[in-house]
């Protein structure tokens, strides 16, 4: 697996961001783009802060994720500037002095107190598009998040630069390292909490550094789509293991899911293999010009074919889709955009001017409705689950005869299956970012 050096790609990435910012400012009628990194938030009636989360608009420009009270200023025709907050503080570790592949491209101003930024920001706040959260306000510099600017920038974030793709490949490698450690822990009989800790140790990131909370689900827990409880006692017997977990690389996320059967549970292992084969066909369908909504509908038909083959449903895949039976077994979307955010922005945008492309009727949880374009990175994450609440709704709707309930009873103790890769849409064939990382890790 060939890894590109993101440092060598950064200058071109920055040039793209500058062009986008210039166009966005023109759309909104502003002279300056001002992006605060964000501030620490404190728990109510307490002096403890929540884990800091950097403004995604900030980390699009810089590979910095732990620099609160800093700012980026872009003015067309000038070098971008960074106002870098490096306080005098003996209570906490302060950010290291600016270094790395990005520093030569910016005018850098070090400040020791947040209010020192006021003298370095553009003179007239009314001429600034300030992108951030309300808590980032400093004096008269209050985030206004003008829609023409935000819509333009978020739409074009859907197309990743080579620099971004290089970092996303790094995040795949880290995530796969954790997935391998987690599977090994499962095979050794570990509980969910211990599996989670093995994952974090292998990745080298704690829960606050990971892009989202790990889903580590044994047996029936896999039927809870976002199960994050991390049980301290392994169930007996161990039947199945679903893990949905990623990693971060300089602010870019990976989002990977795998499902495993315990030794001796051959029929469930066969169903996992069938879902995996179907998922690979879905990944291959990621092509420019293909409507992601159609990919989602096609996924329903493919997954219902798996259930038909395993005797779980009695009707055709098309009938299962039309009657809502398929939604009981596959109740989420096929995936989403990913990049700086796990659920990256503008998944429903009609254009860089805004607007919204609605989800297809009957599919309320799909997170992406756009037509695929080169440079987009999407997740492909089909799943099959045995969720009593949803299956009871099928009965209540009068479609219980479509399901073989004995087969449901057989598979219910396994919870469910989900397989998830990240796929880059290119000018030609789909580029799966996840599978090569697993292949390299497996030697």
UniProtKB/Swiss-Prot annotation:
One of its GO terms (molecular function) is proline dipeptidase activity. The keyword Metal-binding applies. It comes from the Bacteria. GO terms for cellular component: cytosol. It is an enzyme of class 3 (hydrolase). InterPro entries: Creatin/AminoP/Spt16_N (IPR029149), Creatinase/aminopeptidase-like (IPR036005), PepQ_N (IPR048819), Pept_M24 (IPR000994), Peptidase_M24B_aminopep-P_CS (IPR001131), X-Pro_dipept-like (IPR052433), X_Pro_dipept (IPR022846). Its EC number is 3.4.13.9. Mn(2+) 1 binds at residues 255, 336, 381, 420. Binds 2 manganese ions per subunit. Keywords: Dipeptidase, Hydrolase, Manganese, Metal-binding, Metalloprotease, Protease. Coiled coil: none annotated. HAMAP family: X_Pro_dipeptid. Belongs to the peptidase M24B family. Bacterial-type prolidase subfamily. Splits dipeptides with a prolyl residue in the C-terminal position. This is Xaa-Pro dipeptidase.
